[in-house]
UniProtKB/Swiss-Prot annotation:
SUPFAM superfamilies: An anticodon-binding domain of class I aminoacyl-tRNA synthetases (SSF48163), Nucleotidylyl transferase (SSF52374)
Subunit structure, as described in the record: Monomer.
Function: Catalyzes the attachment of glutamate to tRNA(Glu) in a two-step reaction: glutamate is first activated by ATP to form Glu-AMP and then transferred to the acceptor end of tRNA(Glu).
This protein's UniProt keywords: Aminoacyl-tRNA synthetase, ATP-binding, Cytoplasm, Ligase, Nucleotide-binding, Protein biosynthesis
Keyword Ligase carried by entry: yes
Subcellular location, record wording: Cytoplasm
Residues spanning the signal sequence: none
GO molecular-function terms, A-Z: ATP binding; glutamate-tRNA ligase activity; tRNA binding
A GO biological process held by the record: glutamyl-tRNA aminoacylation
Taxonomic source organism: Roseobacter denitrificans (strain ATCC 33942 / OCh 114)
HAMAP family named in the record: Glu_tRNA_synth_type1 (MF_00022)
Name of the protein: Glutamate--tRNA ligase 1
Motif ('HIGH' region): 8-18
Amino acid sequence: MTTTRFAPSPTGYIHIGNLRTALMNYLIARKAGGTFILRIDDTDPERSKEEYVDGIKQDLEWLGLHWDRIERQSLRLDRYAQAADKLRDMGRFYEAFETPTELDLKRKKQLNMGKPPVYDRAALELSDAEKDALRAERGAGVWRFKLERERIEWADGILGDISIDAASVSDPVLIRGDGQILYTLASVVDDTEMGVTNVVRGSDHVTNTATQIQIINALGGTVPDFAHHSLLTGPQGEALSKRLGTLALRDLRENGVQPAALLSLMARLGSSDPVELQTDMADLIEGFDISRFGSAPTKFDADDLYPLTARYLAGLPLADVAGDLSAAGVPDDMAAQFWDVTRENITTLKDIGPWWTLMRDGAEPQIDDEDREFVAEALALLPDGPFDATTWGTWTAAVKEKTGRKGRALFMPLRKALTGQSHGPDMSGLMPLLQVVKARR
């Protein structure tokens, strides 16, 4: 059975980069009729917070990305300890005591000599007495996994054939000096024991994948199918990492972005398929193909979410927005007419309030100097309210006959005088809802 996972750290809220990983893994599992696991990577007790765990769940539920089961790494520490013991017994796990300063000096020396900055395995040469002395002086050391100096190869679902020389990679630290289990080990143990068959994550994990493949093999596990998607950049190709804090899903939600818009964009962004609004999750699942994604950095522009949101809202029936209309103050007996008139002119649900305020209270007129005399003459011909569906046509016909204006020169100044805007709903539909004309004052 196909099994995928999304493994966020509860050290913050889900941002757009996290979503891309979560969505790809979700769609793969659902398309194959498999299992999607939400795995909370909470092995760092100082940074992990329960409020972020709750936030992760809320964001995924808002998007409709429902998991089949949830796991927490903090409840599996004994499993990681057992794996570490196994690696020690195999001679593949060793303690190292260098300080960050010492490691930095080693790296600089290697670079100056034209060599790759790879850990020199000096700790393997320490005697038991030397280790005891270092522990007494510095405390417990870190634990490194001893890589086999060979090429590590796999067929990547996005990047194609990958080959990495392990001799160019430092033996990874799997356990910190304070005993904290790091992601590299915990992830391997979990993926193996949970039967994860497919792992999709960012291309910044490629080297990490190489080391994890060796750890999986050492522990007797089955290597899953890996795929590494490109990293997101800003619309001009700039690094997105510094902006991710402003691209949290809950912030986009607060700004009015709809789940369908977010999912439609992120399911296709970076692939050879065009971005199309999909309102049915089943269609997203059926149309997803990991092989259609490319390796080039993918430009993300949050502004692209709003046209999709607008198209989604325009297609909603009254029943789906009745609560939002009521909250904005639209009377129930006017809701159907209001929604029919405004639905094509709303980008987010936040636009409902301003449109209703305009219709209820009127708008400050926008009148160009060259149109003042014309507008005054036209307003003198505007009948008293209440208006109906024929008012606009009858009024503009009378104004045309009186002034000789026609086309845009006739309609635009009148629209701006009544609504304060140069664009908006069809005026024939809007007039019956317009209760105040401030331009008359």
